[in-house]
Amino acid sequence: MTDPSVHLFGPTDGPTVLAVHGMTGHGRRWRAWSEHLPHARVIAPDLIGHGHAPYTPPWSIEAQVARLSAVLAAHGGGPAVVVGHSYGCALALHLARTEPAAVAGLVLLDPAAELPPDRLLDVAESTVRHDDYTDADEARSDKVHGAWNDVPTELLDEELADHLIDAGNGRVRWRTGTAAVVASWGELARPMAVPPASI
């Protein structure tokens, strides 16, 4: 049976790339990016509390890294080039530090690690206050007027179709667990993991 929380792209016999999304993201976001690496086997799991992964705690960096390790092992093991985005960079660094034999190299995109606690408190509180939208149009507007202002329309449409769900209160929300996201923001105050020099 296929695990809906693990997204696989590219040939099964290609070099392995483990793609780790950022906060409030999901593994399927790597689909368009993976098209630029047609020779590679891209493994892109949803993190705990995101997408189709379990939403139950623990939500620590260690729990996320254990999930990444298990997903990598289930799909042929490493070593893999680990590509992280934002929060995914912190997880990639911890994976490289704790399991260096599984990591062939690191690519860190817009890394988030060892962030100021007061900033993380603001972001976590904002997450609690603003975790849903009136409708899909409001969610789209939030993306377009924020960090997704230069994302092609077709990718934004795909994001809304894949990741926006009914919140159960007449509103819509992203397919994430608010408690998991808030806890994960707190994890980013921890000291940055330093991988072995060999990676």
Task: Give a label for each model feature.
Residues G84-G88, A92:
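Gly/Ala-rich beta-loop-alpha elbow adjacent to hydrolase catalytic centers
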Residues D166-I199:
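Conserved serine/cysteine hydrolase catalytic core
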Residues T2, A32, R41-V83:
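Active-site loop/oxyanion-hole signature of alpha/beta-hydrolase fold enzymes
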Residues G49, A112-L115, L164-I165:
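Short "lid" loop at the C-terminus of a central beta-strand within the Rossmann-like core
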Residues H7-P54:
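Conserved HGGG/HGGXW glycine-rich cap/lid loop of the alpha/beta-hydrolase fold
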Residues H94-R97, A104-A136:
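Flexible "cap/lid" loop of the alpha/beta hydrolase fold
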Residues A124-R129, E138-V151, D162-I165:
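Helix-loop "lid/cap" segments that line or gate small-molecule binding pockets
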